[in-house]
Curated annotation (Swiss-Prot):
There is a cross-link at W105-Y226 (Tryptophyl-tyrosyl-methioninium (Trp-Tyr) (with M-252)). Its EC number is 1.11.1.21. This is Catalase-peroxidase. PANTHER family: CATALASE-PEROXIDASE (PTHR30555:SF0), HYDROPEROXIDASE I, BIFUNCTIONAL CATALASE-PEROXIDASE (PTHR30555). There is a cross-link at Y226-M252 (Tryptophyl-tyrosyl-methioninium (Tyr-Met) (with W-105)). Pfam families: peroxidase. Bifunctional enzyme with both catalase and broad-spectrum peroxidase activity. It comes from the Bacteria. It catalyses: H2O2 + AH2 = A + 2 H2O; 2 H2O2 = O2 + 2 H2O. The record marks R102 as: Transition state stabilizer. Formation of the three residue Trp-Tyr-Met cross-link is important for the catalase, but not the peroxidase activity of the enzyme. It comes from Escherichia coli (strain UTI89 / UPEC). Residues 1-33 are annotated as: Disordered. The keyword Oxidoreductase applies.
Length: 726
């Protein structure tokens, strides 16, 4: 570290002092703007996963590449890999099946149904923080074992698909019949920045299960996938873990039966590793020295691998046949009496005190041990509801196999969206309710049909605001994380969306559009709702003096109520939608942060978000018809007035109350209130990044550009769930 004496001495010798010290001179080094302003709005979340980070280029077509894959040759290679034990990470009982199942499970298990983020769909286990989570110790070895296969098949199989397929093959090679496999997960090339993993600053900080219901978190401790296997906060109490298990699995959309099946099925094969104290384990992959080449957790205990391996610190083998599928998990769970003990690493676990030594040692065939289980395994015996399910599975192994097959498929495909996104020869034919199924198309409107429908909509008496609002309400439920929601299916007309507060005004247009749909018989209601938005935007642009054609692609269908899981669709109800100036709760985040959250779910860039908000305001599309943010005297005209007036220094803004959610814009000279605004409006003048974009649209030469940008962003949102157009 340089001192003043160092600088004096180097100056005296003629050497540049700034090349002598220990200061970080690399790009991005030093104190950052986020260090100075930690609450800075995360506009950068809208710039993730651009083509600039993609080495494959924007023309790469994964579905096309996958079609060239020797799928069954790949599965054959994966099966062979399972028993090709490597000396740098020897396989337990000569099989990597348990390791690969855990890799797939922990990749998929980050999914949270409350916001649709997380999951295995983008291969995020390769990147921080997941590649270095405490619950993912040793999965770096699993991924490295797969590298020769990934190298062989190249871009015909993504890492994201390979992780899940490896888990499937591991189960199948162990004698289990899986439900199927759908490929289609495309890799990204940098960590997701939008996933909220929690506020804790230390790994394995405990969370109360009740807190999980108020936030989109999927684990009871920072750095875990689900729950602490030693019980809540290392309590060692099986019964007390029930609430935590239900909360975490419930946040993934799993019911009690699926939860029991997943825990038992996941613990039928393989083992945990706790040969010695975890203090022997070195830094995780992100913190490991460069020569470790992306591997982490190097152990100094014995050989550090094989019989000396330390992963969780628990040393548990559940079944007598840890490389072959069986019902031994339930048989052992109920047959024996379990006594709390500790692993060689000191972790709390249970041992079957009255059982003979029937469990094979993973590396020494001459040794046997007693069955062992995790604290949370015993929850399946001692919680009354879990016990009922577990005993049924004990007495009906086929029911267990079926339940696990379906739950595993759901676990590993939950974030992929509708079945139409699946590719490959093993996609199950059955439609499942959690896939948000849609019927087959029955309409095929011609160009003339569309023209006729547009005339009917234009003559319906619905205003521009009503037309735009109903289309936005239908399409804006889309979530980029799990590909749920969107306009296809016209679920705006079904429960629960029809009764959401945010849609109260928008759905008033539905009876008119439903009448047009029935009278024409030429298109689905879903298409007509989107077409209503087309008519509204074109009318608004025309009123602004511009002749604009808004692209429209028919082909949407109408879902039935029985194809709609009301409980799961309730999760799509927005806490806030800044595009409509809607906010339901004030106890979560700031309004402007929630606007960014919504825009990110809609896969929008900062300019796209800016154009849409500015356009929605002048079109009068606020959810409640309020004038907040409507900085124009010509509502329904697609002008750039929102930006012009927002940036006009004639007005000063003051909060209307202590909540600082609503503001009045007063004329600086007269004091007259000219406009009212929300935080979702004023952020475009306050935040430096968004203001830079707003200044473009407020310029005297920007009106036509603004309209074209608005239309492009609008069409993007309307088509977010049109996977058939890809």
């Amino acid at each position: 570290m340089s001192t003043s004496d160092d600088i004096h001495n180097t100056t005296a010798t003629g050497k540049c002092p700034f090349h002598q010290g220990g200061h970080d001179q690399s790009a991005g080094g030093g104190t950052t703007t986020r260090d100075w302003w930690p609450n800075q709005l995360r506009v950068d979340l809208l710039n993730q996963h651009s083509n600039r980070s993609n080495p494959l280029g924007e023309d790469f077509d994964y579905r096309k590449e996958f079609s060239k894959l020797d799928y069954y040759g790949l599965k054959k290679d994966l099966k062979a890999l399972l028993t090709e034990s490597q000396p740098w990470w020897p396989a337990d009982w000569g099989s990597y099946a348990g390791l690969f199942i855990r890799m797939a499970w922990h990749g998929a298990g980050t999914y949270r149904s409350i916001d649709g983020r997380g999951g295995a769909g983008r291969g995020q286990q390769r990147f921080a923080p997941l590649n270095s989570w405490p619950d993912n110790v040793s999965l770096d070895k699993a991924r490295r074992l797969l590298w020769p296969i990934k190298q062989k098949y190249g871009q015909k199989i993504s890492w994201a698909d390979l992780f899940i397929l490896a888990g499937n093959v591991a189960l199948e090679s162990s004698g289990f019949r899986t439900f199927g496999f759908g490929a289609g997960r495309e890799d990204v090339w940098e960590p997701d920045l939008d996933v909220n993993w929690g506020d804790e600053k230390a790994w394995l900080t405990h969370r109360h299960p009740e807190a999980l219901a108020k936030a989109p978190l999927g684990a009871t401790e920072m750095g875990l996938i689900y729950v602490n296997p030693e019980g809540p906060d290392h309590s060692g109490e099986p019964l007390s873990a029930a609430a935590a298990i239900r909360a975490t699995f419930g946040n993934m959309g799993m019911n009690d039966e699926e939860t029991v099946a997943l825990i038992a099925g996941g613990h039928t094969l393989g083992k945990t590793h706790g040969a010695g104290p975890t203090s022997n384990v070195g830094p995780d992959p992100e913190a490991a020295p460069i020569e470790e080449q992306g591997l982490g957790w190097a152990s100094t205990y014995g050989s550090g691998v094989g019989a000396d391996a330390i992963t969780s610190g628990l040393e548990v083998v559940w079944t007598q046949t840890p490389t072959q599928w069986s019902n031994y998990f339930f048989e052992n769970l109920f047959k024996y009496e379990w006594v709390q003990t500790r692993s060689p690493a000191g972790a709390i676990q249970f041992e079957a005190v009255d059982a003979p030594e029937i469990i094979p040692d993973p590396f020494d065939p001459s040794k046997k041990r007693k069955p062992t289980m995790l604290v949370t395994d015993l929850t399946l015996r001692f919680d009354p509801e879990f016990e009922k399910i577990s005993r049924r599975f004990l007495n009906d192994p086929q029911a267990f196999n079926e339940a696990f097959a379906r739950a595993w498929f759901k676990l590993t495909h939950r974030d992929m969206g509708p079945k139409s996104r699946y590719i490959g020869p093993e996609v199950p034919k059955e439609d499942l309710i959690w896939q948000d199924p849609l019927p087959q198309p029955i309409y095929n409107p011609t160009e003339q049909d569309i023209i006729d429908l547009k005339f009917a909509i234009a003559d319906s008496g619905l205003s521009v605001s009503e037309l735009v609002s109903v289309a936005w309400a239908s399409a804006s439920t889309f979530r980029g994380g799990d590909k749920r929601g969107g306009a296809n299916g016209a679920r705006l007309a079904l429960m629960p969306q029809r009764d959401w507060d945010v849609n109260a005004a928008a759905v008033r247009a539905l009876p008119v559009l439903e009448k047009i749909q029935k009278e024409s018989g030429k298109a689905s209601l879903a298409d007509i709702i989107v077409l209503a938005g087309v008519v509204g935007v074109e009318k608004a642009a025309s009123a602004a003096g511009l002749s604009i054609h808004v692209p429209f692609a028919p082909g949407r269908v109408d879902a039935r109520q029985d194809q709609t899981d009301i409980e799961m669709f309730e999760l799509l109800e927005p806490i806030a939608d800044g595009f409509r100036n809607y906010r339901a709760r004030l106890d979560v985040s700031t309004t402007e942060s929630l606007l960014i959250d919504k825009a990110q779910q809609l896969t929008l860039t900062a300019p796209e978000m800016t154009a849409l908000v500015g356009g929605m305001r002048v079109l009068g599309a606020n959810f409640d018809g309020s004038k907040n943010g409507v900085f124009t005297d010509r509502v329904g005209v697609l002008s750039n007035d929102f930006f012009v007036n927002l940036l006009d220094m004639r007005y000063e803004w003051k909060a209307t109350d202590e909540s600082k959610e609503l503001f009045e814009g007063r004329d600086r000279e007269t004091g007259e209130v000219k406009y009212t605004a929300s935080r979702a409006d004023l952020v475009f003048g306050s935040n430096s990044v968004l203001r830079a974009v707003a200044e473009v649209y407020a310029s005297s030469d920007a009106h036509e550009k603004f309209v074209k940008d608005f239309v492009a962003a609008w069409v993007k949102v309307m088509n977010l769930d049109r996977f058939d157009l890809l």
